[in-house]
Structure formats: C-alpha cells, structure tokens
C-alpha cells in the first residue's frame, strides 16, 4: 500500500467510526468489574488511557476515580469528539486530551499509576507496546491492556487465514502472558470480553453507520473489510476475541 493509499485508508476508517461511542469492542460494565478488583491506587493517582478513541474508557476512568486522565490518540477527529463528550458529561476538568503518538510519549519514567489501553496495542504489536509502555508505569503500578487473542489451540482455518493477514503477531493467551512477563510485568488476571458485547456496543452501531455513509472507492474497501471481519466473528467467536490482561509492573 502506497503512502497516499494508506492515508486515504486511514481517513476512510476514521470517517467510518466518526460519531460512534466506541471505536472498537468494549463494555463499561465489564470494565467496571475489572476496576473494582484492582488494588487501591495512590491518593494522587496518575492515570492514562492510550489509544483512547473518543473516550469511552477515559471518561469511565475519570468518573470512577474522580481523578485526571491523560487520554492519548493519534486521531485529531477522535480527540475532538472526546473533548465534546467530556464537556457534555461535566468531566472536562478531569480529561487531559493529548493528540499524539502513543509510541513516542516523552513522559517521565514511572509517571503513571494506572495505564489503560483497549484495542490499541496491536498497532505496535502487543509485546512491543508493553516494552515501550513499561518504563512509564510506576513500580507496582497497574496496566490493563486488551489484546486480540486466540482462545484455543485447535483453530479453524478461515480464522487463521484471516488473522495471519490482518494481524500476523496475534498470539494465544498463554503466549501473551509470556510476552507480558518478558516485558517487565506480572500477570494478575485475564478476562475475556463476552462476544455479545462486541455486537451490542460495536458491530451493530457500526452496521448502522455503514448504512449512512456515502460510498467512495476508499470507503468501499474499508466497508468490505469490516463486513468480512463481522462475518468471521459471527462464525468463530468461540475461538478468538479480546482478552483483557491485568498487569503489575515488577
């Protein structure tokens, strides 16, 4: 893919997700269960959401902890949506929107007590993301990272073929635990995002959005790939999905 084509593709993908509450699968109740089981953070806690999209998790974290959240995303469109949503919820004083590259943060070592990232680590590769982010997390600090993961060792060929092309570094949960350990984290727990919330909170709103879009050559390609992804998940959601890895910096 040429640079121009890549730029057009990213623009079309951004436009497809414009206005959606979530830019990927997730669920507030599911996240709250994880948060309720985390160890107590310092009184002056430092929280970051990397790859925040339009802020579904950042806003939840701000509400839950009543603490500032540094929310980072490379899309200015999504950052603008986050600012609007924060204002609507009366949380603008707690949200620190940062338009930037989550792989090139110039933050001090140990400057984050809770690092949260949903559906974004794959952009760097799970292990690479953890190695880049580990220095940011304080000693014994917590990271909660969701990562596309295989759930079983016996895998259907169509799913393998699709993901070898879409995300060749995708591993199973055991492999990802090993990767986390190699990156300076202890794995405290893992939690699989239920397949039904993929549909309820992400795929169904995405389908409605597709019906509203004006079709262009670049959007046509993105829509075709998105529909292929949805069909695959409909058939094989027992075999893969997002696992949330709750990690402690060691």
Language-model segments: residues:
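Conserved Class I S-adenosyl-L-methionine
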Residues: 191-250
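Short, glycine-/aromatic-enriched active-site segment of Class I SAM-dependent methyltransferases
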Residues: 148-167
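A short glycine-rich, Lys/Arg-flanked "PGG" loop and its adjoining helix->strand segment in the class I
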Residues: 128-142
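A short SAM/SAH-binding and catalytic strip from SAM-dependent methyltransferases
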Residues: 114-127
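Short alpha-helix
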Residues: 169-184
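Class I SAM-dependent methyltransferase SAM/SAH-binding core
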Residues: 48, 54-104
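A short acidic, Gly/Pro-enriched loop at the edge of an enzyme's catalytic core
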Residues: 105-114
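Conserved alpha-helix/loop element of class I SAM-dependent methyltransferases that forms part
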Residues: 24-43
């Amino acid at each position: 893919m040429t640079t121009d084509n890549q730029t057009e593709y990213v623009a079309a993908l951004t436009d497809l997700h414009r206005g959606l509450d979530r830019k990927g699968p997730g669920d507030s109740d599911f996240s709250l269960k994880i948060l309720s089981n985390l160890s107590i953070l310092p009184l002056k806690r430092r929280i970051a959401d990397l790859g925040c999209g339009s802020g579904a998790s950042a806003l939840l974290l701000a509400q839950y902890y009543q603490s500032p959240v540094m929310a980072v995303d490379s899309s200015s469109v999504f950052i603008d949506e986050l600012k609007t949503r924060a204002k609507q919820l009366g949380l603008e004083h707690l949200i620190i929107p940062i338009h930037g590259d989550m792989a090139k943060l110039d933050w001090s070592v140990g400057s984050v007590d809770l690092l949260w990232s949903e559906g974004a680590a794959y952009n760097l590769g799970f292990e690479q993301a953890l190695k880049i982010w580990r220095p940011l997390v304080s000693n014994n600090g917590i990271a909660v990272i969701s990562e596309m993961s295989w759930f079983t060792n016996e895998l259907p060929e169509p799913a393998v073929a699709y993901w070898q092309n879409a995300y060749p570094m995708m591993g199973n949960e055991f492999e990802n635990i090993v990767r986390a350990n190699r990156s300076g984290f202890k794995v405290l727990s893992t939690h699989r995002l239920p397949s039904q919330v993929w549909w309820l909170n992400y795929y169904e709103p995405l389908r409605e959005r597709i019906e509203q879009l004006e079709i262009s050559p670049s959007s046509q390609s993105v829509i075709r790939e998105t529909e292929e992804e949805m069909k695959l998940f409909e058939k094989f959601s027992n075999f893969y999905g997002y696992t949330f890895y709750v990690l402690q910096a060691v």
